[in-house]
């Protein structure tokens, strides 16, 4: 029987980060991935030779002192990825269709303050107060700064108040509230359900800058894999844990894999959905309260996605800005699973060199919730019924109609390459429900992070801390500290941050 110091389950951003952090400290690590390839939603797929991003479309935190940049430096990966930043004057373009207003958001909190005060001359106090609060939350959050990761953290007052309540207290201007809620598409929770603290932590680095990696998330996967080769890391794809065994003194000693192999371990980090974690825990080791807590977690937003090309004409703005079309200013409605009006769209353009030819691609994201997929929950890719195919055709037609109404050039130049539903993501990524951000990060909720009832099992991932690549990676920094011991991890981080 093989023995590993640690097993990491799931090879998305969190699992890759944890594996490298553990291996860099001399640990022997087994990385398990249920899919045929590592990387999760960081990976790309290709149609007609053109690459498209599966789930990692853009991120914040890639400025010199940004959180993601600092994590990449600590991992030794910073020089192996190349950020491509959105336009400084309009990283995000918000089009509020019901009121006929377009608001461009520049990079940098200072520039954004000035821009929004100019756009909303009667709301200058509200704008200043909002950004003051965002900066206050992030300054008081130790995990937003790797050099302060070892500091004890306390829950802030802003953990207990919703984004909606804060915005309602600042202004009665519906459009301004819509602008300040716009990046909620990056975590998929209604303003009344999201704490202002969590909203601030997600948005802060996106306000400072928005970027993608050249060659997409694949370049990050490849960087991790290069570093694994010189370390005690073994990777197994199409492989997962069926059950834990040899439970003694509230600790598991070995895991039975789907291959029939048994492996022994010191500890296991599970970067998968909390419901999937729950299925792995021996029933006699968990309380009714623990089960109820996990079962109460709700799915976050997912997306119906249209992939295509934009050859011909001028579409520079689709490459340099993230454009969001919002039919309403009310994000309580737009992010409600029960909403049946016209959906928002997020347009992410890119430019790729294929065979020496520059091609423009566009990924169109339309909000969709796992709940809407209930009629087809028990079906799988390639074996869906006609009603599901009709649903996909209906969504594609609605998205194309919406795009052309916004800009007639899409009718002339956009060519559909493929489409994906929430179920497509679920099956392709081997995820629990196909949601984009794991569980909803709800006000007053205690996520599953760190040590589990089986005491040498741990939880991390974007459902554990914050959604997105940076949140998933940061959860691994926090939990690996518990796995290897605070003092040892602090010494390790001291050397990495000095490099």
Language-model regions, residue ranges each:
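A conserved FAD-binding loop/helix module that cradles the flavin
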Residues: 462-487
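Mid-domain catalytic core of redox enzymes
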Residues: 242-357
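Rossmann-like flavin
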Residues: 98-194
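Short beta-strand to alpha-helix junction loop
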Residues: 63, 152-163, 204-226, 387-395
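A glycine-rich dinucleotide-binding beta-alpha-beta segment and adjacent secondary-structure elements
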Residues: 175-187, 405-466
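Helical element adjacent to the flavin cofactor pocket in flavoenzyme catalytic cores
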Residues: 200-253
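C-terminal segments that line or cap access tunnels to active or ligand-binding sites in enzymes
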Residues: 312-420
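N-terminal glycine-rich phosphate/pyrophosphate-binding loop and immediately adjacent elements
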Residues: 2-129
